[in-house]
């Protein structure tokens, strides 16, 4: 009887361990904290002169990922520890604001890129040299784009890079439900995700500026480069 009981207990323990991954994902998806952290916000990230961070929440998301990845070989921590990690997600607005900012900024960059690409450099600087019109464009670039837009884009990059890496790591946890995988792929997957679309839009926009200013010899280091002043 004793060996039979031992075998039954071993089988029961193995059975419970086999369901840990499913239980983990069910609990994570059912939590409002997790859902709210990875959804669109009503407002984008604020424009701030000081650096905005989301370190505590990203660290909590990484820890939740480590817990899921270690299952079923390693048992999860107690409920209080899990609740503390979820609370860190709940206390952060940055992820949802970042998601909204990525969508809005990508759209804005795409529109601005189309305008730049539609500008005929032959009319802007007929002699392939700085002209009065190209100097106006350079003024816009230095005062508006480099002075106001680029700092915000840098803020998105600083906040978004560790966030995207954390989302990608969570996506790799085994036994992820299809719906959850799709949602995370849409946020930071390799193709057609918010993060990748933003990166592509930023690259194209930067290239559009370089092409247009370069055609008028107005890039940094070229003869037409100067630092305009307001007014």
Stretches with model-predicted labels:
Residues 1-111:
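Acidic/His-rich structured neighborhood in mature extracellular/periplasmic domains
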Residues 92-231:
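A cross-kingdom marker for long, charged
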């Amino acid at each position: 009887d004793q060996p039979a009981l031992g075998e039954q207990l071993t089988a029961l323990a193995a059975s419970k361990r086999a369901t840990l991954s499913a239980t983990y994902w069910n609990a994570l998806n059912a939590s409002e904290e997790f859902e709210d952290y990875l959804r669109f916000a009503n407002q984008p990230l604020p424009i701030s002169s000081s650096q905005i961070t989301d370190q505590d929440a990203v660290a909590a998301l990484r820890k939740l990922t480590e817990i899921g990845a270690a299952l079923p070989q390693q048992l999860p921590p107690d409920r209080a520890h899990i609740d503390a990690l979820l609370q860190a997600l709940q206390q952060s607005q940055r992820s949802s604001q970042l998601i909204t900012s990525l969508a809005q900024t990508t759209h804005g960059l795409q529109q601005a890129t189309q305008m730049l690409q539609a500008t005929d450099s032959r009319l802007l600087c007929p002699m392939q040299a700085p002209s009065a019109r190209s100097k106006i464009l350079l003024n816009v670039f230095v005062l508006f784009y480099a002075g106001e837009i680029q700092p915000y884009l840098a803020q998105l990059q600083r906040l978004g890079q560790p966030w995207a890496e954390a989302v990608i790591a969570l996506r790799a946890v085994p036994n992820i439900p299809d719906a959850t995988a799709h949602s995370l792929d849409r946020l930071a997957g390799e193709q057609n995700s918010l993060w990748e679309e933003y990166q592509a839009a930023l690259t194209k926009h930067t290239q559009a500026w370089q092409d247009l200013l370069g055609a008028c010899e107005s890039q940094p280091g070229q003869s037409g480069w100067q630092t305009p002043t307001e007014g």
